[in-house]
Amino acid sequence: MADIHTVEQSTVLHVREEIPTIISPTLGNVGPLTIATSTITTMFITLIFIILCISVSRSKLIPNKFQHLLEIFYEMVDSFIASIVGNKERAKEIVPYVGAIMTYLIIANLLPMFPLIGSFYITIDGEHFPLFRGATTDFNTTFGLALAVVVTMQVIGIREQGVFGYLSHFIQIKQVIKGFKKSFGEGMTSIVGFFVGLIEIVSELAKVLSLSLRLFGNMFAHEVLTVILLGAFSVAVPAIWMGMGLLVGVVQSIVFVALVTVYYSLVLKKEHGEH
């Protein structure tokens, strides 16, 4: 039987006593779905996200302080994406999707650092685990997010270029036929391009692992190092390591979003004059 309780916080930064496991502790099952501690965190983040969306939908002509902060954040994301894409109009199209991902990741990466969140523990078979495990320290979360991103990119690519136009980047049969019609040499060259296109399919699938493992590996490694370092230097290090944790959480969010922005811009239909 799982028992939920709280522990008193001695520092502004929550310090765990045990090194976290790669697999999140399981709380139970709802039908075929397994509910883990990271699932609770994800649901809590979703609730925060809904509150933010409601707040934005009720924005006023004369912004209050919170609305002003959200507008500053939007402008920062817009400028960041425009610097990657190199086209302000394209950036405006990408901002809503990528901005939502960045907001989610920043909340997910920084939420476990708040002392109130870290004060809730659950006892499973005599062992104590944090009730709110960092969502991005669970590979299931990062894999699901990366898979959703890659699938969305395929849908956008088909929407922008058409089914056959988009698939022609991967299965270049027409290029092979055209190549052999021109000459044998160009035909052989087009065959090479055909196999390169097939490799691109593998590349698209690899993006799922690349995005998910990068985010999971960095955030999980940071959590493990937090336990080790704060366990050894629990007096002097917490404030310094909290700053490092904030930096790691924000940087990993930016890296993930930058890669998604690049993937998004690649599947958009090229406009006249773009190369």
Model-derived segments and their meaning:
Residues 2-275:
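Selective transmembrane helix interface/packing segments
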